[in-house]
């Protein structure tokens, strides 16, 4: 982990703006060729990084259906429940970016992450809103590979953190992120059905102060 300290918000903002100008941030990282494809036990996947505006609406529909299959039941036991219209609206946000894994043999989409670059409680972050993998492709290292790709994007654009949310009642997902080194973020609420996890890549000396100021 880098020990550069970003105490100047203007520096963070410039890094965010640079990342936001990129139509394909995965292609810009030095390791882009290493993350273009992933193979496991005879299965071969290609990774595509696209803006929401460049995606066929059918892909967004698939992303929603996959989220519904994977986590719909978990949401149904939470106080706010499963809200399909809100989920559909979230997936269709103009700022949304998608990293999609395609099975090269079938040409079918099998996994995706949805993310954005943002200033979150005073920190420059890549915020991962979704990580969904088709059930038959889970536990093959694909999800971890896609998260690693996001981490390299974070490092390339000098973001401070990669941040994500996970439902507390989804133990497999919680274990998955913990295994990858994600820890409870200082912004995570105590009284919600979800928790915020993060991995810090660039430290700041005033992160806690930024959070307290934003919450006050």
Model region roles, listed by residue range:
Residues 130, 151, 164-166:
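Short acidic/polar micro-motifs centered on Gly/Asp/Asn
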Residues 160-163, 167-175, 179-216:
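C-terminal "cap" of GNAT-fold acetyltransferases
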Residues 140, 157-160:
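Short coil/turn segments at alpha/beta junctions that flank glycine-rich nucleotide-binding fingerprints
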Residues 139-152, 179:
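Conserved acetyl-CoA-binding loop-helix of GNAT-fold acetyltransferases
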Residues 6, 12-13, 17-22, 34-35, ...:
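Acetyl-CoA-dependent GNAT
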Residues 62-66, 145, 149, 196:
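Alpha-helical elements of Rossmann-like donor-binding domains used by nucleotide-donor carbohydrate transfer enzymes
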Residues 134-136, 140, 168-169:
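Active-site acidic-Proline motif in GNAT/NAT acetyltransferases
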């Amino acid at each position: 982990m880098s020990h550069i300290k970003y105490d100047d918000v203007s520096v963070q903002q410039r890094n965010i703006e640079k990342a936001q100008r990129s139509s394909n941030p995965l292609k810009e990282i030095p390791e882009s060729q290493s993350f273009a494809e992933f193979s496991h036990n005879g299965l071969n996947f290609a990774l595509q990084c696209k803006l929401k505006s460049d995606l066929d609406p059918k892909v967004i529909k698939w992303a929603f259906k996959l989220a519904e299959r994977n986590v719909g039941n978990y949401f149904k036991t939470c106080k706010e429940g499963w809200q399909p219209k809100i989920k559909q609206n979230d997936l269709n946000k103009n700022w949304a970016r998608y990293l999609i894994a395609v099975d090269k043999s079938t040409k079918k989409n099998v996994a995706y992450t949805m993310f954005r670059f943002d200033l979150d409680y005073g920190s420059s972050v890549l915020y991962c809103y979704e990580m969904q993998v088709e059930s038959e492709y889970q536990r093959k290292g694909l999800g971890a590979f896609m998260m690693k790709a996001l981490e390299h994007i974070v490092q390339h654009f000098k973001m401070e953190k990669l941040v994500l949310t996970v439902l507390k009642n989804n133990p497999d997902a919680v274990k998955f992120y913990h295994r990858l080194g994600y820890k409870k973020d200082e912004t995570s609420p105590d009284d919600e059905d979800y928790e915020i996890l993060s991995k810090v890549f660039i430290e700041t000396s005033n992160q806690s102060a930024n959070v307290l100021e934003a919450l006050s």
